[in-house]
Curated annotation (Swiss-Prot):
Domain of life: Bacteria
UniProt EC number: 3.6.-.-
Protein name, as recorded: Uncharacterized Nudix hydrolase YfcD
Sequence motif: Nudix box, positions: 72-94
Source species taxonomy: Bacteria, Pseudomonadati, Pseudomonadota, Gammaproteobacteria, Enterobacterales
Gene: yfcD
Cofactor: Mg(2+)
Record's keyword terms, sorted: Hydrolase, Magnesium, Metal-binding
């Protein structure tokens, strides 16, 4: 019994201020001790200005019932960031076989969480297959609608979305300048 319990334990890399792996811990220990770790954040959008928003189930170990402006999750021990993003998108929403754009990394910290986030995006129109134990529902919202309801969202996903929007605006500005 003990061996089976250990085999099902989810292990995560614990990182320092420079995002260097310094240890591994169980996901449960990481949450209980608010250890610094890595996570992926995937902005799923329709390519026409709407963002796919998910409601977290009430059974989630972190911020249950809140809205997420991004898909994603904790990176497992020794897992590559893009591999983690693809795994999370497929597990949570059934998204597979679509290109992912990488938008760099960022750091987020508050009283509940210390995380190095890897930011990705993808375009998808569904249909979506929700992971019942993690996602209770999804809907499409504009960035303005998300901002108007920001108190309903996980703070780390709002930071990821703001960073994506800022980096997207810079890319669009460069493309416009190049086209002129």
């Amino acid at each position: 019994m003990e061996q089976r319990r250990l085999a099902s334990t989810e292990w995560v890399d614990i990182v320092n201020e420079e995002n260097e792996v310094i240890a591994q811990a169980s996901r449960e220990q990481m949450r209980a001790q608010c250890l610094r770790h890595r996570a992926t954040y995937i902005v799923v959008h329709d390519g026409m200005g709407k963002i796919l928003v998910q409601r977290r189930t009430e059974t989630k170990d972190f911020l249950p019932g809140m809205l997420d402006a991004t898909a994603g999750g904790v990176v497992q021990a020794d897992e590559q960031l893009l591999e983690s993003a693809r795994r999370e998108a497929e597990e949570e929403l059934g998204i597979a076989g679509v290109p992912f754009a990488e938008h760099g990394q960022f750091y987020f910290e508050d009283k509940n969480c210390r995380v190095w986030g890897a930011l990705f995006s993808c375009v998808s129109h569904g249909p979506f297959a929700l992971q019942e134990d993690e996602v209770s529902e999804v809907c499409w919202l504009t960035p303005e609608e998300i901002t108007a309801r920001c108190d309903e969202f996980t703070p780390d996903s709002l930071k990821a979305l703001a960073l994506w929007m800022k980096r997207n605006a810079k890319n669009e500005a460069v493309e416009t300048e190049t086209a002129e």
